[in-house]
Amino acid sequence: VYGMLFKFLAKKVAKKLISHVAKKQLQ
């Protein structure tokens, strides 16, 4: 159960990091 929750949180964090980096790259 915790493994699924961790994967879900990891994906959300990864998406936030990717979008954040992408915005910095565009500037």
UniProtKB/Swiss-Prot annotation:
Alphabetical UniProt keywords: Amidation, Secreted, Toxin
Tissue: Expressed by the venom gland.
GO cellular component, one term: extracellular region
GO BP: any one term: defense response to bacterium
GO molecular function: toxin activity
Spans through the membrane: none
Family: Belongs to the cationic peptide 04 (cupiennin) family. 08 subfamily.
Entry protein name: Cupiennin-4b
Species of provenance: Cupiennius salei (American wandering spider)
